[in-house]
């Protein structure tokens, strides 16, 4: 006996709903998480460079030739150390490369690097907003496909 047309339509609607839900959870949400994780790493790098800028500015203000400090060797194990010459600093360029720079050169590098990281974080934020818009569009499509009514947004109190 043949399946009635209405039953076949419901089966295809159910299959479409399942495919859309799978696409949302397996592709879009995973992509969104990757973009947000990448943006968080960029924010961490930006934070490190801004901290370095503050340290360099304090070094320039105090004009000390020696610096006493504690260095973290790992696992929160600190040792006291003396930096004999604070006129030059080693800056991590990336990919394991370090460069010895004067404090003024380091500030220029930090300004350029922080502006690039800010642009990258802005781009990643736009990408995440696009992915969120795609997720919202897919959910609206699912709502229409299932014939659900649009529920009102909860009002903020």
Swiss-Prot record:
Cellular component GO terms held in the UniProt record: centrosome; cytoplasm; cytoskeleton; nucleus; RPAP3/R2TP/prefoldin-like complex; spindle pole
Identify the main location.
Answer: cytoplasm
Key word Oxidoreductase present in the record? no
Instruction: Output the Gene Ontology terms for molecular function.
Output: beta-tubulin binding; chromatin binding; transcription corepressor activity
Location of the protein in the cell = Cytoplasm; Nucleus; Cytoplasm, Cytoskeleton, Microtubule organizing center, Centrosome; Cytoplasm, Cytoskeleton, Spindle pole
Which family would the database say this protein is a member of? Belongs to the UXT family.
Q: What is this protein's function per UniProt?
A: Involved in gene transcription regulation. Acts in concert with the corepressor URI1 to regulate androgen receptor AR-mediated transcription. Together with URI1, associates with chromatin to the NKX3-1 promoter region. Negatively regulates the transcriptional activity of the estrogen receptor ESR1 by inducing its translocation into the cytoplasm. May act as nuclear chaperone that facilitates the formation of the NF-kappa-B enhanceosome and thus positively regulates NF-kappa-B transcription activity.
Subunit structure and binding partners: Homohexamer. Component of the PAQosome complex which is responsible for the biogenesis of several protein complexes and which consists of R2TP complex members RUVBL1, RUVBL2, RPAP3 and PIH1D1, URI complex members PFDN2, PFDN6, PDRG1, UXT and URI1 as well as ASDURF, POLR2E and DNAAF10/WDR92. Interacts with LRPPRC. Interacts with androgen receptor AR (via N-terminus). Interacts with estrogen receptor ESR1; the interaction relocalizes ESR1 to the cytoplasm.
Supply the name of the protein.
Protein UXT
The beginning of the lineage is: Eukaryota, Metazoa, Chordata, Craniata, Vertebrata
């Amino acid at each position: 006996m043949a399946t009635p047309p209405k039953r076949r339509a419901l089966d295809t609607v159910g299959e479409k709903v399942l495919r859309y839900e799978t696409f949302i959870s397996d592709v879009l949400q995973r992509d969104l998480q990757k973009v947000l994780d990448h943006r968080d790493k960029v924010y961490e790098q930006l934070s490190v460079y801004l901290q370095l800028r503050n340290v360099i500015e304090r070094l320039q203000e105090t004009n000390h030739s020696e610096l006493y400090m504690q260095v973290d060797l790992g696992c929160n194990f600190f040792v006291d150390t003396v930096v004999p010459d604070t006129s030059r600093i080693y800056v991590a360029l990336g990919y394991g490369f370090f460069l010895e720079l004067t404090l003024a050169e380091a500030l220029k590098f930090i300004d350029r690097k922080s502006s690039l990281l800010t642009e990258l974080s802005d781009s990643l934020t736009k990408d995440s907003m696009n992915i969120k818009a795609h997720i919202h569009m897919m959910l609206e499509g699912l709502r229409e496909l299932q014939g659900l009514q649009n529920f009102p947004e909860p009002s903020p109190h």
